[in-house]
Amino acid sequence: MSDTPRKLSLNKLSLKRDSAPEAPKLEERLHKVLAQAGLGSRRALEQRIADGLIKVNGAVAQTGMSVRSGDKIELDGRSFVASALTESSRVLVYNKPEGEVTTREDPEGRPTVFESLPALKGSRWIAIGRLDINTTGLLLLTTDGELANAMMHPSYEVEREYVVRVRAPEGEEKVPDSMIERLSRGVLLEDGGAKFDEIERIGGTDSHDWFRVVVKEGRNREVRRLWESQGCQVSRLKRTRYGKVSLPRELLRGQSVELAQEKVDALRAELKLEEGAPSALTLQPVIGQRRAAKSTVHVSRDGRSNAYVNGQTSGADEGRELRRFDNLREDRGGRGGRGKPGGFKGGLTVSGEAAAKQSQQRPFKQRGPAKGDRSLPDGNPAAFRSWYVPDGVSTGPSGHRNAGPGGAGTGQPRPYAKKGPGGARPGAGGQGRGAAGGQGQSQGQGQGQRKHPYGHPGNAPSFPSDHANPGFSPYGAARPANESYKRRPPRH
């Protein structure tokens, strides 16, 4: 037995398990990762890298550089993180209706196709080509950016088939065959030559013709511009096929269905893309990054201005909510001083900010001295006086403020030319003048001419104390001037 002391070894207890060795980080070329995320074609992205428009981990990216999972990439003011792609490619078939645009965010607030798609976790849908707002039919979307760029690129010559309804040009009952042959040979558009690779007449009516056309390019509004170059008008346009994928007949508008994985693999094989996972890396947007600051909306004089919609400033006419407070409206003259001469005359007025500007720009006009009574203008009085009553129009009984025939001038003949009861009425017999001061006609055929013209307050019913002649009574014959007025005794 040895006398040498033995050293005791203490084993440390730990709850940590032996971690597996870290897998090497995936590495891919930058432009390939950007294309996989659906940010553009590889050639266009290489040019943007060369122009210094892309940053990796805060530094300007260089042409041909590679990125690894976890690297931070900045592009167009947005931040992304490179991450491994864990699922295979997916393709969605969507039957696009009219009124939807093929953009993620529309500055004019119109509905987009992405609002109707199923949600994704860890990836996003990328549109394969675009359809304008009035075009319906097949729209393909995928999570594979490389597949999307290959199907859209003209070098792959992927066919797009459309059904189109066309109205013949002016002077033609239908689209002539010579025009169809010209479109199949090729015509010159603003951005170069274009043609229909296939064109077939499939029907028509007295006013329209139906065609099936095929193109191998995806230029902006190419089908419509080809027909418009020949003076034809496209009234309906629907895409029915894209490559080997056709629009299912049972798929309703606004609905989508996912393509089977076997067909997705067949698409990649046809385009000679790599089998299996499309790429090792993709981009994920950084969570919580701030949007651009909201801009203030200023309404100009004509009511048009830029507006803030969905975090962006639109250059379109987006002042609908503000312009409604500056609409022109018509005010008609009402009763009182508005409808009469010299009063307020209805016209077009404005309200809101436009009215405030008009009041500030209107010069101050000082009121001059009084000009006295104005003479009536010549011509028809009805043109400038709404209360004018023409001759021959009955407006009320005689003696009333609105007197009838004879109250304003020479009276009309009485029935049977008989005198009234109780003898001749004042001013109604012979050529004598009555109490009314008018000129009577013979045979009692009218009342006397009033002392005052029509409308004068003197013609209104009044009491003796209010009338110029104290002997006048509207209830009986005239009282002699020397007879004093006797007050009726009070009733008990």
Swiss-Prot record:
EC numbers for this chain: 5.4.99.22
Listed Pfam families: PseudoU_synth_2 (PF00849), S4 (PF01479)
A single GO molecular function term of this UniProt record: 23S rRNA pseudouridine(2605) synthase activity
Catalytic activity: uridine(2605) in 23S rRNA = pseudouridine(2605) in 23S rRNA
Region called Disordered, residue ranges: 1-24, 294-492
Cross-referenced SMART domains: S4 (SM00363)
Biological processes annotated in GO: enzyme-directed rRNA pseudouridine synthesis
Coiled coil spans: none
Keywords associated with the record: Isomerase, RNA-binding, rRNA processing
Domain S4 RNA-binding intervals: 28-97
Active-site residue numbers: D132
Spans traversing the lipid bilayer: none
InterPro entries referenced in this protein's UniProt entry, alphabetically: PsdUridine_s_RsuA/RluB/E/F_cat, PsdUridine_synth_cat_dom_sf, PsdUridine_synth_RsuA/RluA, PsdUridine_synth_RsuA/RluB/E/F, PsdUridine_synth_RsuA/RluB_CS, RsuA_PseudoU_synthase, S4_RNA-bd, S4_RNA-bd_sf
Compositionally skewed regions (Basic and acidic residues) per UniProt: 15-24, 317-334
NCBIfam families: pseudouridine synthase
Biological function: Responsible for synthesis of pseudouridine from uracil-2605 in 23S ribosomal RNA.
Record protein name field: Ribosomal large subunit pseudouridine synthase B
Highest classification ranks of the organism: Bacteria, Pseudomonadati, Pseudomonadota, Gammaproteobacteria, Lysobacterales
Name of the coding gene: rluB
